[in-house]
């Protein structure tokens, strides 16, 4: 499944033991992400305005809404190289699409201050990337969205392939922090558990 493909997402919270049993069941039918056979850490930074516009849109069930998320990948052992993305998550009448552009991880700090980093403004950027930049101008520069929380978890992902329509992910070890630090791949410094008991988010 392509990363920017339109999708309908369903999320479930399972006890850790039940989640692992379900993961093994899915693994018997859908291939694991190539190159990440034993999983990978995900570090995310979510944006919102000072009056929590994105949060309240979700709570009120607004049919057409967007939010900004920065995300970095990479493993400390180097098996997955560092990579940074800025993403627009767009929900429309229950369907979701993710538009994203790659950029140097260190450029995310500039974006967090409300500025479009120069690497995103290069004329060689694709049409899709320029669309993302236009949305960042709208949501970050004009509307004033800034990072409000950073989240870390470990993911196992199973995907039906570029021509398929199914992707199942298992996220464990969910932790967060509200002091906005520079995003670093595989950063362990997330002191707050998202939930009291260990769960799997599917």
State what each model feature region is.
Residues 1-201:
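Phosphate-end processing signature that detects enzymes handling 5′-triphosphorylated RNA
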